A protein has these predicted regions:
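Auxiliary alpha/beta "docking" domains used to position bulky ligands
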Residues: 1-185
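Iron-sulfur cluster-binding cysteine motifs and their immediate structural context
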Residues: 26, 191-214, 220-223, 229-257
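Short, charged low-complexity linear segments at domain edges
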Residues: 155-180, 206-226, 277-281
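SIR2/sirtuin NAD+-dependent deacylase catalytic core
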Residues: 188
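Conserved Radical SAM active-site core
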Residues: 244, 248, 252-277
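Long, compositionally biased charged/polar accessory segments in the mid-to-C-terminal portions
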Residues: 282-283, 290-303
Length: 303
């Protein structure tokens, strides 16, 4: 059995801002809500969300011998996360200016597992970061990191919602497990709902991906509402996060691995239109921007 304080201390030393630990078990209530969301068609072109639903909400089906899950979060909040000038037509979600978080967090989780392996004999693990069907936000809530805001994102008291999640599923029990937060939440605040240009935020903390700018600028193109626009966003969208009071009062990130690699001040429309693919890859080769590619980003300009 692993002492929880050892896990937390090592995870913080690795560079995570928040850490919680939960038992690996089925999350039936959360699965029911997700299945209802799917039945309403909110997933749009995100067909992968329809697969492996049972595994998504039961980690023991994903990882043989799973006993515990270490849930980690790290802030990426930077000055650009506070919002753009209203006239900007080349807005990019602030997480995309840094190295691809899938790579960085996987490295951090591997370091965490290696260091814990020195403390615990026979430790086996599997690392996740938005890379397999695992209900990350549900696990984060169960681990006491925060709550689900009206915009469907995890919100935390100290760091707001500009966070990236990673999980380590391990084969060992822990001496104590965390529980969900009590007495905190969004209250009557509707800033995120009111700020969404396309009314993508539905009641009950749900998102209609057909209207969500982040989905429309990044994911596979397909069915969408006729009245949708991109409001100047060309990759992702921070509209519902930049207005959140918890983000406005959160500290900027302190982990240098998430420092922006791209100078946003030079990326106006003319810069994008005059950029070659080689220029693009040299600038953004290991950032999330390559997921869309230069042609798709240009196509989003002016929509």
């Amino acid at each position: 059995m692993i002492p929880k304080n050892v896990i937390i201390n090592v995870a913080k030393e690795v560079g995570f801002d928040l850490v919680g630990v939960v038992a690996a078990e089925a999350m039936d209530d959360e699965r029911k809500g997700f299945e209802e969301w799917l039945l309403e068609g909110n997933q749009s072109t995100l067909a992968y969300l329809e697969r492996n639903v049972e595994k998504r909400f039961n980690p023991t089906l994903l990882v043989e011998g799973a006993r515990s899950i270490i849930v980690c979060a790290v802030s990426y909040l930077s000055p650009v996360s506070r919002g753009y000038d209203a006239t900007c037509r080349t807005k990019i979600a602030s997480y995309a200016f840094a190295r691809d978080y899938h790579l960085t967090i996987k490295e951090m989780l591997a370091e965490l597992a290696e260091r814990l392996g020195h403390e615990v004999e026979g430790l086996r693990f599997r690392a996740f970061t938005d890379s397999a069907p695992l209900a990350e936000k549900s696990l984060a809530v169960r681990a006491g990191l925060g709550w689900i805001g009206r915009n469907s994102l995890l919100v935390t008291p100290r760091y707001g919602s500009m966070l990236l999640l990673g999980e380590l599923v391990i084969n060992k029990a822990v001496d104590s497990y965390d529980v969900p937060m009590q007495g905190v939440g969004c209250g009557s605040c509707r800033a995120c709902v009111d700020s969404c240009p396309n009314r993508a935020i539905k009641p009950n903390r749900l998102i209609d991906t057909r209207r969500c700018i982040s989905c429309r600028t990044i994911e596979r193109e397909g069915e969408q509402c006729e009245d949708i626009g991109l409001d100047g966003w060309i990759f992702g969208c921070d509209a519902c996060q930049s207005v959140c009071p918890f983000n406005r009062h959160a500290p900027l990130h302190s982990n240098p691995r998430f420092d922006p690699k791209i100078d946003i001040s030079r990326l106006d429309e003319a810069a994008w239109q005059g950029m070659t693919n080689d220029d693009f890859l040299a600038m953004a080769g290991d950032t999330p921007l390559v997921r869309s590619g230069l042609e798709r980003i240009r196509k989003n300009i002016g929509k």
